[in-house]
Amino acid sequence: MVFWVPILAYVAVVLLTALSFARAAPPRGPALVARLLLRYICLLPVGLMGLWGALGHLVFPAQSAAAIGWTTSPFQTEVGLSNLGIGLAGVIGAFYADRGYRLALAVMTAGFLGGAGI
């Protein structure tokens, strides 16, 4: 199930973007598509999945550690709190449509998740 959650989140992003674009009043253009994509990416893959990751690391540390091959340690609390911050920032970014805020969120998320993937 864990494998499918990110894939389903991105499928939901595409579907919600298409639905919102179809319901938007004219004129509709590429700028609207970009804003809608950013909104739903902030909400689902960044926001809700960040909160989900925080829940796993903070509330179920033993199961999370076993699932990713770690030993249970205080580092999980650090990762869980980082996920909590990213998740909250993502949910805020979905509804606070400031370009600078969303850019900062993208840079921070890319740095954290890119570093975690290396």
Segments from the language model and where they lie:
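Membrane-interface helix-boundary motifs at transmembrane edges
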Residues: 25-41, 96-101
